[in-house]
Amino acid sequence: MTYNPRIGGFTHVKQASFDVHVKRSEARPRTSFAQQIKRIFSKIGETLGQLFRHRAPDGAPGRVKLQGVRYVGSYRPTGDARQAIRHFVDEAVKQVAHARTPEIRQDAEFGRQVYEATLCAIFSEAKDRFCMDPATRAGNVRPAFIAALGDAARATGLPGADKQGVFTPSGAGTNPLYTEIRLRADTLMGAELAARPEYRELQSYARQQAIDLVANALPGERSNTLAEFRQTVQTLEATYRRAAQDASRDEKGAANAADGA
């Protein structure tokens, strides 16, 4: 698949063999990260367009309507809303894995782009999660966390730049496969379930499933790097959250001492 600037999209190009494809992609200049993300979403858009234009194949999950505490339709669990929504998220993950795993493994350039986009998504989500939490305001913990997070991202080999002494990946954002999973899940479950609060609560689960999907499709070295980065980010979050708690206690202690003086 080749980007055509005249039409603002991608066209299919026959390749003689996988080896030839790899050599050609190695010879091409490295595109900007924004262009890479555009290519990934273009692929996803083509697939989702087909999904919306055609009926679901036999055996695919039917849409579900709420009737009290039970759900009607085929190929679905009965019970509470959370159980039903989890079912459709899992089904969406299976469909995306079926569609994208061969592409990630066979298209070297696409696989690299998805890999880097997933690392950037982990970085962005961790930064937002930590810095938007009121519990991390105390002390000077947030800048220290961002600096440590940037060092961890740099160690993966991600493209990026130093901004005021802190490394920032050049393509921070949302995992494109998570976006595809969510859109597919929306289609499978229908508007009524998609509007329920249980669906929003399961988005963290869907994000983790998207990362697992990419990790399982990548070659061993990149899969290991992805797993190590996830673990490093979790460790950093736990460490700096404890530091924020300690700083908050110290500030409260100092304030109480001043009041008692």
Curated annotation (Swiss-Prot):
Q: Where is the composition biased (Basic and acidic residues)?
A: 241-253
Q: Give the UniProt keywords, A-Z.
A: GTPase activation, Guanine-nucleotide releasing factor, Secreted, Virulence
Q: Which GO terms describe its cellular component?
A: extracellular region
Disordered as annotated region, ranges: 241-261
Where does it localize? Answer: Secreted
One Gene Ontology term of the molecular function aspect: guanyl-nucleotide exchange factor activity
Q: Which domain of life is it from?
A: Bacteria
Instruction: Please classify the protein's predominant subcellular localization into one broad category.
Output: secreted
InterPro entries reported in the protein's UniProt record: SopE, SopE-like_GEF_dom_sf, SopE_GEF_dom
Biological process GO annotation list?
Answer: actin cytoskeleton organization
Question: Its quaternary structure?
Answer: Monomer. Interacts with human CDC42.
**Role according to the record:** Activator for both CDC42 and RAC1 by directly interacting with these Rho GTPases and acting as a guanine nucleotide exchange factor (GEF). This activation results in actin cytoskeleton rearrangements and stimulates membrane ruffling, thus promoting bacterial entry into non-phagocytic cells.
Q: Which family does it belong to?
A: Belongs to the GEF (guanine exchange factor) SopE family.
Q: What is this protein called?
A: Guanine nucleotide exchange factor BopE
Q: From the UniProt record, report the name of the gene that encodes this protein.
A: bopE
